[in-house]
């Protein structure tokens, strides 16, 4: 019945708050508990909540607002100053995971095309979970977090181009590589121009309207417009939302927007996003794939941790900061889930492997929060010991 959706929302909000609190009491970031509770109340365990189109859309709004908040908290000058490090981290986080995924696929008996796609899937990075963990830890404004966010942007661009190339080369889709690259150029050129000139003008134009919360509404209009524009041109909507947050952070409206959007995001939409990730897991028919799942999870974690960490180390970060950046890039999150769905529909990913890979993606997402907490803790202890 349609009204059962109201109960589902109430259950999601209650369970995420309780699970987040328990996670903090156990010394872990709150996001870990929220991810786990999605598995518990979802189809995999209790089955109280089933995936639906409405929950999916609420989840999409949640991740868009989460990345918009990350953009608001990002220092543009710091982001620009760390662009070389971000690019190196992104490259390290693509090359090693691709090789690891491709070789693993061949060893496990996959066909050539499936192995290539597995390598590309392991290249994906979603820092939305890392962003929440950094907020929990009070580390959003560190150099490491800025580098992670910049690397995620580069990673998204490169992975989309590589995916388009693979689909074209393997003959599974009619993909125009020139058009794919052109769309990326148009997106970022437009975002820079609109963010520099258009966003301040839009905020000034809409803020005097004699209606309630005109400034917040103006900010959300910009946020969702940027996200839509990104999706339209083949860039993840979360990148558009992140860019919108950065653009508004350069205006005088930053603090008011941040103060008023945060309750909207965290009271309703972000909890649905966290639960929806866990709800993607199902344990049906995975008994004979358990070793594949465990092996691929280890490969997925180590290749990102080492590859991204190496990129950071080569651009001036010390060992502990490099480990932090590597840990923050491990999560594949919703980005990899979308790519997996694309691979399944295009024939690049066999149905036999789909469920197992979804579980691997979610395991990497759940591993990220405790890894970030541990690596930041190790750095903080070292800094205190040196004083």
UniProtKB/Swiss-Prot annotation:
Q: List localization entries.
A: Membrane
UniProt keyword Transport, yes or no: yes
Query: Which residues span the membrane?
Result: 29-49, 54-74, 87-107, 114-134, 149-169, 175-195, 219-239, 263-283, 290-310, 324-344, 347-367
Q: Which domain of life is it from?
A: Bacteria
Phenotype upon knockout is:
Disruption causes a major defect in inosine-dependent germination, but does not significantly affect germination in response to L-alanine.
The record's Gene3D superfamilies line, in alphabetical order, gives:
1.20.1530.20
Q: Give an example GO cellular component term for this record.
A: membrane
Please give the Gene Ontology molecular function terms for this protein: antiporter activity; sodium ion transmembrane transporter activity; sodium:proton antiporter activity
Q: Supply the alphabetized keyword list.
A: Antiport, Germination, Ion transport, Membrane, Sodium, Sodium transport, Transmembrane, Transmembrane helix, Transport
Membrane topology type, per the record? Multi-pass membrane protein
Q: Which InterPro entries match?
A: Cation/H_exchanger_TM, K/H_exchanger, Na+/solute_symporter_sf
Q: Which biological process terms from the Gene Ontology are attached to this UniProt entry?
A: sodium ion transmembrane transport; spore germination
UniProt-listed NCBIfam families: 2a37
Q: Which family does it belong to?
A: Belongs to the monovalent cation:proton antiporter 2 (CPA2) transporter (TC 2.A.37) family.
The role this protein plays is: Na(+)/H(+) antiporter that extrudes sodium in exchange for external protons. Can also use potassium as a coupling ion, without completely replacing H(+). This Na(+)/H(+)-K(+) antiport is much more rapid than Na(+)/H(+) antiport. Can also extrude lithium. Important for the inosine-dependent germination of spores.
Protein name (database record): Na(+)/H(+)-K(+) antiporter GerN
Supply the gene name. Answer: gerN
């Amino acid at each position: 019945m349609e009204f059962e959706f109201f109960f589902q929302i109430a259950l999601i909000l209650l369970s995420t708050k309780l699970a987040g609190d328990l996670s903090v009491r156990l010394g872990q970031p709150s996001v870990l508990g929220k991810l786990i509770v999605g598995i518990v109340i979802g189809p995999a365990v209790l089955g109280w909540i089933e995936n639906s189109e409405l929950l999916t859309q609420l989840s999409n709004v949640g991740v868009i607002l989460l990345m918009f908040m990350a953009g608001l908290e990002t220092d543009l000058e710091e982001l620009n100053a760390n662009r070389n490090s971000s690019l190196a981290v992104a490259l390290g986080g693509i090359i090693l995971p691709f090789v690891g995924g491709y070789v693993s696929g061949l060893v496990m008996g996959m066909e050539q095309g499936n192995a290539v796609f597995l390598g590309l899937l392991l290249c994906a990075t979603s820092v939305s979970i890392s962003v929440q963990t950094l907020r929990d830890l009070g580390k959003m404004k560190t150099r490491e977090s800025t580098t992670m966010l910049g690397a995620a942007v580069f990673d998204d661009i490169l992975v989309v181009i590589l995916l388009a190339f693979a689909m074209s080369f393997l003959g599974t889709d009619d993909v125009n590589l020139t058009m794919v690259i052109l769309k990326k150029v148009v997106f970022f050129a437009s975002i820079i121009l609109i963010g520099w000139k258009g966003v301040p003008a839009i905020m000034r134009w809409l803020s005097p309207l004699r209606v309630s919360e005109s400034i917040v509404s103006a900010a959300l209009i910009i946020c969702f417009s940027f996200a839509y524009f990104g999706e339209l041109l083949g860039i993840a909507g979360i990148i558009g939302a992140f860019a919108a947050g950065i653009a508004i952070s350069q205006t005088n409206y930053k603090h008011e927007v941040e103060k008023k959007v945060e309750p909207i995001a965290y009271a309703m939409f972000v909890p649905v996003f966290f639960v929806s990730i866990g709800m993607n897991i199902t344990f049906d028919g995975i008994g004979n794939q358990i070793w594949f799942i465990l092996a691929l999870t280890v490969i997925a974690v180590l290749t990102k941790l080492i590859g991204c960490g190496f990129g950071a180390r080569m651009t001036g970060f010390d060992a502990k900061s490099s480990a932090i950046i590597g840990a923050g890039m491990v999560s594949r999150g919703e980005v990899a889930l979308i790519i997996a769905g694309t691979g399944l529909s295009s024939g690049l990913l066999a149905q036999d492997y789909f469920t197992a890979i979804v579980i691997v993606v979610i395991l990497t997402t759940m591993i990220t929060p405790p890894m970030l907490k541990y690596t930041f803790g190790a750095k903080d202890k070292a800094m205190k010991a040196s004083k």
